[in-house]
Amino acid sequence: MSEDLYEDDLDTQGSSGPRHPMAERFRGYLPVVVDVETGGFNSATDALLEIAAVTIGMDEKGFLFPEHTYFHRVEPFEGANIEPAALEFTGIKLDHPLRMAVSEESAMTDIFRGVRKALKANGCKRAILVGHNSSFDLGFLNAAVARNDLKRNPFHPFSSFDTATLAGLAYGQTVLARACQSADIDFDGREAHSARYDTEKTAELFCGIVNRWKEMGGWRDFND
C-alpha cells in the first residue's frame, strides 16, 4: 500500500496564506509520541494496560518541545490475554486500589480528542506516531481502534517515526535509557516501563534529535 493514498488529506501544496511552521516542517503531519504497556507482544490477543501520548509543539525559532501529556491506565478488554511475565516486567498491579483504569474506548477517545485539538492548533491534517520501537506501539493503537470501531483516528495508519532508529543514528544507542543518557536527558530506571514516564522521555529524546539536526543546519523553515 502506498503512502500516496493519504497525500490528499495533507493539502501540502497550493494553500493560501502562510502555513504554521509545524505543518511545514513535517509536510502537514504532527508528531505525537506514544507509548503503551501491555500484557504481551500480540496486539490482537494481549491486553492494552496503559497508554500515554505527548503532543509536540514548536517555538518561534522552529525548535520542538514536548507540549501536553495524556495518560490512561486501561482495563483489559474482554477475553484479553495477560502474561505474568509482562506484569512482572512492567510492575503493573491490576488489582491496585488506586489504578483507576478506564475502558479502551474511553482512553482512546480522550487521547484522540487531544490530538485533534493539537492538529488544529498547528495547522496539520494528520498525526504521525513517534515511538521507541514505534511499530509495537502503533500496532497496539491500531488494534484498539479496530476492537472498539473508533472513527476519526487522527494517526497515520502505518507510517511512524522510530526513536530507536533515530537514536542509533544520532548517538549510536538504541536502548531508550542509554540513548537518553547519551543525549544528557535524565533517566530514572525505577520509573521506566510506565507509559507516562517512557513517553515523556521519548518525547524529550525525539525533540532533542530533531533540534540538534536543525542546529547543524539540516533543516531551515520557510521563513529563513
Curated annotation (Swiss-Prot):
Binds two Mg(2+) per subunit. The active form of the enzyme binds two Mg(2+) ions in its active site. The first Mg(2+) forms only one salt bridge with the protein. Residues 1-22 are annotated as: Disordered. Its cofactor is Mg(2+). Keywords: Exonuclease, Hydrolase, Magnesium, Metal-binding, Nuclease, tRNA processing. GO terms for molecular function: 3'-5' exonuclease activity; magnesium ion binding; nucleic acid binding; RNA exonuclease activity, producing 5'-phosphomonoesters. InterPro entries: Exonuclease_RNaseT/DNA_pol3 (IPR013520), RNase_T (IPR005987), RNaseH-like_sf (IPR012337), RNaseH_sf (IPR036397). Residues 1-11 have a biased composition (Acidic residues). It comes from the Bacteria. The active site is at H193 (proton donor/acceptor). The keyword Cell division does not apply. Mg(2+) 2 binds at D35, E37, H193, D198. Its EC number is 3.1.13.-. Pfam families: RNase_T (PF00929). Mg(2+) 1 binds at D35. HAMAP family: RNase_T (MF_00157). Belongs to the RNase T family. Trims short 3' overhangs of a variety of RNA species, leaving a one or two nucleotide 3' overhang. Responsible for the end-turnover of tRNA: specifically removes the terminal AMP residue from uncharged tRNA (tRNA-C-C-A). Also appears to be involved in tRNA biosynthesis. Homodimer. This is Ribonuclease T.
